[in-house]
């Protein structure tokens, strides 16, 4: 066998070595270029400036990105949205003088808003801190110089005094001692009588407690309703009512002597007519009317201006259908003049004309969470709701329409010129309010 000649083998070896050297040089040159010009991150565009900052700042940026977005809601009748809380709002209360709105949230603050700013572009609030706890319920004192809250973790009442400053704001100071713990079940509502004589607290079992302002229990009411779903003090301060699993609303009178001393709590009357458990109820501003909503899918308006001591029962004035109440919990608010009934289920609000029993307005997906509280201001001009980190205020157009209907009816029967002038003035004011909101029916 012949072997290859030596010159040919040497030439082939030199060619292979030269090719390997060229390839190595090309790879090394590519690495050098990569080091001179680092590649852009995938999430960063070519022209985007490089982000700088410390590790702590980057962590804070990540936290802000994870913060839930504020729920967006718009409607022609939305008057304002109050946004200062960083946590979900659970309760609201208008002061008796109509100047302030108190809100509490799980961000450990209570905020006091000025009602005169509602229609302004900016809504300022004053903050009261709830130390080492947060409030779930809040109520103004009758003189508007204090408010009480229910503490979520402490399971008791705390009183805050409001001291007016020279600049028009307030300084908030919690009293040294909270009320003693008495309830054994979760609290559903609290209240202060407009007379300032007593405080009410109600829990989800069957207990309603009547306290004096010093934190002493005056009376314990057993509602015998299997469980309580709502309880409230009447605006006249004479009555305390409750509703729950049973198909009725029970009302008691809190009796005081001529010298202001507490005497007793007596059963006054009941609202009977529903066929299932009652979700909620409310008194009118003069305590002469009441409204209730039940799991039987109806709401009812009652005349409670009766001589209950002579065994006279309240009169049923109107029954309306509300099927949503038969499948889910429902909140209720009655306008001060009883012309409008607001019902809330989930995140939606329905407004009814109580004279005709018809639904007039519907607000859908008002909040990002289920509506926690619903109330009219003391003038009946606005309806307020909360359910996330904002309070939403609506113009009460059904209330203005009800005034128009009522004044037109009364004008036909007016006998004196002075009466006609007064009624015509109220009619004109209501029509102008509707016109300004674009809600005047032609």
Swiss-Prot record:
Cleaved signal peptide residues: none
GO BP terms, alphabetized: cellular response to glucose starvation; cellular response to hypoxia; endoplasmic reticulum unfolded protein response
Disulfide links within the chain: none
Matching SUPFAM superfamilies: WD40 repeat-like
Modification Phosphothreonine occurs at: 428
Membrane-spanning parts: none
Top-level division of the source organism's lineage: Eukaryota
WD repeat residue numbers: 84-123, 130-170, 182-222, 224-263, 273-312, 323-362, 366-404
Composition bias type Basic residues, residue spans: 52-65
GO MF terms held by the record: phosphoprotein binding; protein kinase binding; translation initiation factor binding
Covalent crosslink: Glycyl lysine isopeptide (Lys-Gly) (interchain with G-Cter in SUMO2): 164
Xref: PROSITE patterns: WD_REPEATS_1 (PS00678), WD_REPEATS_2 (PS50082), WD_REPEATS_REGION (PS50294)
Pfam families: WD40
Name of protein: Transducin beta-like protein 2
Organism: Mus musculus
């Amino acid at each position: 066998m012949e072997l290859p000649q030596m010159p040919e083998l040497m030439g082939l070896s030199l060619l292979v070595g030269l090719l390997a050297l060229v390839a190595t040089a090309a790879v090394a040159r590519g690495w050098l270029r990569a080091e001179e010009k680092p590649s852009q991150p995938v999430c960063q565009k070519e022209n985007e400036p490089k982000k700088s900052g410390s590790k702590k700042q980057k962590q804070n940026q990540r936290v802000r990105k994870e913060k839930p977005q504020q729920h967006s809601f718009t409607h022609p009748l939305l008057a304002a949205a109050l946004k200062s809380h960083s946590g979900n709002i659970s309760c609201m209360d208008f002061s008796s003088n109509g100047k302030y709105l108190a809100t509490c949230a799980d961000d450990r603050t209570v905020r006091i808003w000025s009602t005169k700013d509602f229609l302004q572009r900016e809504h300022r609030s004053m903050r009261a801190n709830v130390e080492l706890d947060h409030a779930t319920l809040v109520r103004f004192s009758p003189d508007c110089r204090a408010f009480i809250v229910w503490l979520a973790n402490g399971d008791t009442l705390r009183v805050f005094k409001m001291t007016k400053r020279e600049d028009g704001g307030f300084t908030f100071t919690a009293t040294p001692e909270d009320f003693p713990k008495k309830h054994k079940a979760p609290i559903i509502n609290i209240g202060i009588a407009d007379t300032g004589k007593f405080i009410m607290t109600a829990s989800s079992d069957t207990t309603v407690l009547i306290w004096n302002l010093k934190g002493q229990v005056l009376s314990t009411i057993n509602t015998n309703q299997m469980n309580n779903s709502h309880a409230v003090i009447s605006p006249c301060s004479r009555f305390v009512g409750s509703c729950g699993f049973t198909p009725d609303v029970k009302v008691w009178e809190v009796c005081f002597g001529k010298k202001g001393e507490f005497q007793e709590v007596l059963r006054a009357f009941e609202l009977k007519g529903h066929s299932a458990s009652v979700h909620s109820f409310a008194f009118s501003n003069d305590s002469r009317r009441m409204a209730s909503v039940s799991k039987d899918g109806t709401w009812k308006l009652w005349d409670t201006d009766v001589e209950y001591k002579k065994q006279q029962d309240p009169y049923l004035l109107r029954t309306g259908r509300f099927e949503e109440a038969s499948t889910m919990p429902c909140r209720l608010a009655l306008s001060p003049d009883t012309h409008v009934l607001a019902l809330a289920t989930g995140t939606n609000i329905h407004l009814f004309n109580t004279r005709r029993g018809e639904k007039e307005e519907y607000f859908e997906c008002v909040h990002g969470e289920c509506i926690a509280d619903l109330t009219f201001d003391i003038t009946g001009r606005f309806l307020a709701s909360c359910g996330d980190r904002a309070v939403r205020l609506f113009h009460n157009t059904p209330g203005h329409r009800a005034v128009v209907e009522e004044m037109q009816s009364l004008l036909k029967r007016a006998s004196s010129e002075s009466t006609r002038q007064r009624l015509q003035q109220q009619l004109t004011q209501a029509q102008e309010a509707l016109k300004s909101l674009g809600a005047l029916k032609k």
